[in-house]
């Protein structure tokens, strides 16, 4: 009798779990479809151009990168050099690609991210965007060209401002560092179309993988945003450029199979006052430092926005020129 009761209870528990999973799966699938439809409707109603390759599955993009002939040779060479099995090196490459490749979602970018950015930026700043100059430049760009928007780097808020300013015409993809590889930021940034990079990681094979990914999305027409300074300016003057990603893009022109134009659009972001002003002044006087670009520094920037909202007026002028 006890055995029968135990079996009956177990059957009810299993049945309950199965029912819950079926209902949950159906609900999640329906919600995902509704969110995708809402994002697509938003983009269509505003005639926003989205790069098709952004919607390719992550597994497909990863496989395209892995299909690079020189990458396969480099994996074999790295295994021989390190005395490790080829499978171990391939596993490392797969892990890096998992970090790098995004999973763009229109609802996440336009209905969630854009709405939050608009609320925060317009509440904190007076945002001035030279849309005429931007539209004038974009009209001159060939429809099949690969476009790279090149920004100066004045503040930790630049990433938000750049995406917000261009969102009415294009959703750009750009690299983000290790600071964003924490939950839930990693999932959010992937859905915003950002790809993750390991700054300061010296492994040559990793940089080959990253370069092949960047070159792949350029070949497929994905519009990118690049901050060549690689870090905030300390005094308002442009820093010496770090040409990593720009070099990956420019080197494609040496490939005879690549026939597209690559258009670099310089975009200026200027402030009356940056969020990090107090820290920058202290650093200039030798009494402090902004330190490395970390999640903590980004959170500090967010706190600065909240703390200064009642009194700070910032004019951001974004201008583009061919």
Label for each model-derived stretch:
Residues 143-151, 222-224, 228-229:
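Pre-Walker A (Motif I) flank of P-loop NTPase domains
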Residues 2-148, 155-161, 186-187, 191-193, ...:
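Membrane-anchoring hydrophobic helices of lipid-metabolizing enzymes
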Residues 158-173:
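Classical protein tyrosine phosphatase
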Residues 197:
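Hydrophobic residues at beta-strand termini and immediately following loops
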Residues 153-157, 231-233:
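Gly/Ser/Thr-rich loops at beta-strand to alpha-helix junctions
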Residues 142, 167, 219:
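Short conserved AdoMet
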Residues 172, 177-194, 202-322:
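A cross-family acyltransferase "interaction/gating" segment
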């Amino acid at each position: 009798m006890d055995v029968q009761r135990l079996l009956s209870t177990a059957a009810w528990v299993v049945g309950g779990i199965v029912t819950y999973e079926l209902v949950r799966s159906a609900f999640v699938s329906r919600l995902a479809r509704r969110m995708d439809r809402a994002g697509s409707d938003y983009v269509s109603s505003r005639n926003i151009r989205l790069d098709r390759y952004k919607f390719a599955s992550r597994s497909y993009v990863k496989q395209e990168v892995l299909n690079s002939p020189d990458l396969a040779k480099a994996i074999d060479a790295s295994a021989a050099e390190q005395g490790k099995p080829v499978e171990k090196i391939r596993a490392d490459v797969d892990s890096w690609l998992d970090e790098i490749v995004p999973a763009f979602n229109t609802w996440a970018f336009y209905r969630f991210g854009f709405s939050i950015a608009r609320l925060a930026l317009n509440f904190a700043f007076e945002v001035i965007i030279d849309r005429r100059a931007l539209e004038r430049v974009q009209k001159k760009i060939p429809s099949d060209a690969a476009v790279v928007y090149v920004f100066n780097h004045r503040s930790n808020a630049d990433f938000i401002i750049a995406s917000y300013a261009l969102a009415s015409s294009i959703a750009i993809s750009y690299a983000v560092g290790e600071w964003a590889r924490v939950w839930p930021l990693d999932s959010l940034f992937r859905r915003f179309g950002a790809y993750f990079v390991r700054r300061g990681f010296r492994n040559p094979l990793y940089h080959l993988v990253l370069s092949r990914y960047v070159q792949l999305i350029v070949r497929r027409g994905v519009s990118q945003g690049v901050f060549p300074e690689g870090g905030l300016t300390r005094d308002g003057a442009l820093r010496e450029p770090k040409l990593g990603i720009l070099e990956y893009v420019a080197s494609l022109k040496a490939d005879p199979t690549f026939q597209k134009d690559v258009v670099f659009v310089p975009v200026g972001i200027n402030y009356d006052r940056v969020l990090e002003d107090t820290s920058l002044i202290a650093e200039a006087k030798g009494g402090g430092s902004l330190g490395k670009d970390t999640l903590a520094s980004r959170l500090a920037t967010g706190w600065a926005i909240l703390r200064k909202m009642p009194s700070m007026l910032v004019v951001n002028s974004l201008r583009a020129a061919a």
